[in-house]
From Swiss-Prot:
Catalyzes the methyl esterification of L-isoaspartyl residues in peptides and proteins that result from spontaneous decomposition of normal L-aspartyl and L-asparaginyl residues. It plays a role in the repair and/or degradation of damaged proteins. GO terms for molecular function: protein-L-isoaspartate (D-aspartate) O-methyltransferase activity. This is Protein-L-isoaspartate O-methyltransferase. GO terms for cellular component: cytoplasm. The active site is at S59. Keywords: Cytoplasm, Methyltransferase, S-adenosyl-L-methionine, Transferase. InterPro entries: PCMT, SAM-dependent_MTases_sf. Its main location: cytoplasm. Belongs to the methyltransferase superfamily. L-isoaspartyl/D-aspartyl protein methyltransferase family. The gene is pcm. The lineage of its organism: Bacteria, Pseudomonadati, Pseudomonadota, Gammaproteobacteria, Enterobacterales. Its EC number is 2.1.1.77. It is found in: Cytoplasm. It catalyses: [protein]-L-isoaspartate + S-adenosyl-L-methionine = [protein]-L-isoaspartate alpha-methyl ester + S-adenosyl-L-homocysteine.
Length: 208
C-alpha cells in the first residue's frame, strides 16, 4: 500500500506515458526523501528536479522513469550508470537488476550515495570514483548504460563498452539537449532521438 503522495506521482507518470509497471513499482519502492536534503523533504514526491549540492541535481521522477524504461532491462541485465549523484537513480536500477555498476566523478557524492544505498539495504551496487567519460572498462561489456548528465557528444568509450544488442540512454548537447537512445546491433550503432531535455553537463575528469 503506497501513500497518497506516491500514488499521485505514479498516476501522473502513467499519464505522461510511462507504461513499464516494473519501473513504476521500483519508483514506489525507493523513498526519494532519503536522497535529498531535509530542506526539500516536502517536495520529495513532486515531479521536479531538486538540487543535491556540488552543482548537481536529483532528476525529476518522470525523467528517471523514462530513461530507465528506455533501457529495456531484465533482471540479468549488466548495467552501468554514469553519474551516481545522490544515488536515487542507482537505487531504482538496483531494484530492477541483479547488479549495478556506477561511476561518480565527485568523491563526496560517491560516498554519500554509498551510505544511502547501504542504509536502504541495497548491496547489489558497485560504485567507483572516476571519469564518467571513460566508463568502466574493467567491468564491460554492458547490456545497458545510463548517463545522468549531458556530454556535448556521445562518448566513444561508452559506445564501445556496450555489448551486442546493448542500449545506451543519455542526454546529449550543450545549449540545446536531446535524450538519445543508442542500440548496438551487428557492429553498428543505431541512434534515436527521444525528446528535448535539460541536464547538468557531463564534465570530464574527477574531483577529490
Amino acid at each position: 500500500m503506497v501513500s497518497r503522495r506516491v500514488q499521485a506521482l505514479l498516476d501522473q507518470l502513467r499519464a505522461q506515458g510511462i507504461k513499464d509497471e516494473q519501473v513504476l513499482n521500483a519508483l514506489a519502492a525507493v523513498p526519494r526523501e532519503k536522497f535529498i536534503d531535509e530542506a526539500f523533504e516536502q517536495k520529495a514526491w513532486d515531479n521536479i528536479a531538486l538540487p543535491i549540492g556540488q552543482g548537481q541535481t536529483i532528476s525529476q521522477p518522470y525523467m528517471v522513469a523514462r530513461m530507465t524504461e528506455l533501457l529495456e532491462l531484465t533482471p540479468q541485465s549488466r548495467v552501468l550508470e554514469i553519474g551516481t549523484g545522490s544515488g536515487y537513480q542507482t537505487a531504482i536500477l538496483a531494484h530492477l537488476v541483479q547488479h549495478v555498476c556506477s561511476v561518480e566523478r565527485i568523491k563526496g557524492l560517491q560516498w554519500q550515495a554509498r551510505r544511502r544505498l547501504k542504509n536502504l539495504d541495497l548491496h547489489n551496487v558497485s560504485t567507483r570514483h572516476g571519469d564518467g567519460w571513460q566508463g568502466w572498462q574493467a567491468r564491460a561489456p554492458f547490456d545497458a548504460i545510463i548517463v545522468t548528465a549531458a556530454p556535448p557528444e556521445i562518448p566513444t568509450a561508452l559506445m564501445t563498452q556496450l555489448d551486442e544488442g546493448g542500449i545506451l540512454v543519455l542526454p546529449v548537447g550543450e545549449e540545446h539537449q536531446y535524450l538519445k537512445r543508442v542500440r548496438r546491433r551487428g557492429g553498428e550503432f543505431i541512434i534515436d532521438t527521444v525528446e528535448a531535455v535539460r541536464f547538468v553537463p557531463l564534465v570530464k575528469g574527477e574531483l577529490a
